[in-house]
């Protein structure tokens, strides 16, 4: 019987994990090991993927992957241990403190002035970035979705200037399955930080401790931060920290990063272990008695075999031993074993497999989870089913229900756009426009009274106020849209959208995880492109990056709002929503084209942890909105201001630098006139339109500022309804801004960046031409 055949609500014991390569190793690292109990929670609304519970947490996987896992059904769970009944009064081991782990007389600190470097390592969605912000005072974005951090972030611990802490992408193990796992593993292995701060989600402790055990093998000073302890205690659970510290051999500090509780104590221990280079007391967690010590003997034999090679390669020997037993080719290549040693290694491993009755990877994973189970049985008072879990189950009955999930998603997105464009955002925009207009009148009167030079007067009023002011008025709409996107991500809903949409996205050749970068793309293409790093398949990553520009970013909102208010005032919300839908539809058609040509093959397997729903943090939402508002304002007073001044200058002077009365005689008209034949078939043959679209390559918001400067409010007399619609469609689809192209270049290289610019312009021209023909 396979996991695919197990009915909803039923439990079983895993007997065999099929498949091969990195995906199989990833399943084992996630706890899908022979002997583990698994329960089917539900199927996605479209029947695939499935959600299962294992080791106390929820995991999603496709039916095709579930078919590779053989099981034996059981009537009820048998290994759902309760842990200890109550926390014991165990003596504190005092690890990471002076006078206990070592004598004060024999302290040997690192030289004064040495930079103490730290790696902040933990599972995805365990609160790493929140802790990083508390440690450093930084304001990194925090979300409730696995994989928010997609690149390393560095900062200095507050109050300790000779420190540097690096927030690494969330990982489940030190196996190189995804690009973020490779980033984190390489940092620890190659850059050799002075210490590791391992953050563990105490509400999901068994899953998180798997990574802890691998980090202990790195032989680097380490402190374990038990995060979310406030939730554990709130659900009547507890952790015997002293016993856990003694069993792990490193300091263990209970904290709540969100509430800034226990962080100061964590810092003191982190500084101490790095300063005195206190490495883990224990690294040997294999049981000598387990299956006659088969795994124990294997690990120790391999340690002796590769010891000199590991030292030469600069890899911790215990870590190297378990990795080569698992079959990690990257580590094996670094060790450079000769033919005889390789043959001996394989002989040792095959003998262990024979005695243990499991293959090499499963045996090592089982050894780790076996120790974790013993550890938790002696140290953890199991909490009652958490309020967060109960609440999540109730919400999921609606938001991921078979018949309600898709309607709910559509309804939520429609509500978000309606509130943004017709209610909250529109009202705030009107308020800001009124303020800018009043200020413009006051400044105009002051400049006139002061008898300021006509050119300067024109620059300030017709250039800066008209251009930058018009763009600034769209700030409320952008902030409002980001507010709703932040609520969706912070609450944990976006992770459910990935689960619900996986089967649908698979039809166009993508994984459900690709929905996340695309949804982020509605905010800004730059972070959306970066978010693709969480995708484990290079094929999926490239395809998602190339499709992201079809998701209309907030920078285009000023263009839509400007033309809609002039040409379609009665149907504002409908036209704007229609543009978003059109972008998605064209993106879908292009995806089918990619699937059959450039990106043939199967999408990456869908393996993802579903976090509990959480109330969005007010501070986090405020932080995100401030960041987006600040970015927009910086752009408005840098790129857009410069673009506005340049456009004003070029359209105010001729080639001999004489001020012109008719802008048709200006430098700008001469240059932009070269492009007008290209845009004439779209009904956009005016040089001023071509100029504004060119300025949009620097920043999409500058399209509106350029139009305001060049037309001065008379654009309604120049364009027809059909040409305005064509311009909207062209703006929706043509090349992303220079910042987005730079991020694509960074991820895929110069060739792909150039291809994206040309390809998007071709698609935009064709779609705009068809739109003009249909309406005309």
Task: Give the ranges of each region predicted by the language model.
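Conserved G1/Walker A P-loop phosphate-binding module
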Residues: 91-173
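Conserved C-terminal guanine-recognition region of P-loop GTPase G domains, centered on the G4
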Residues: 160, 185-252, 559, 566
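Canonical P-loop GTPase G-domain recognition
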Residues: 232-287
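Extended helical scaffolds that flank P-loop GTPase cores
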Residues: 249, 276, 283-450, 659-668
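Extended, low-charge hydrophobic alpha-helical regions
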Residues: 362-366, 382, 423-464, 508, ...
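Hydrophobic core segments of alpha-helical transmembrane domains in multi-pass membrane transport
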Residues: 408-419, 481-486, 564-566, 579-593, ...
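Juxtamembrane inter-helical linkers in multi-pass membrane proteins
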Residues: 438-442, 495-525, 600-624
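Transmembrane helix-loop junctions at the membrane interface of multipass transporters and ion channels
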Residues: 550, 554-577, 739-749, 768-776
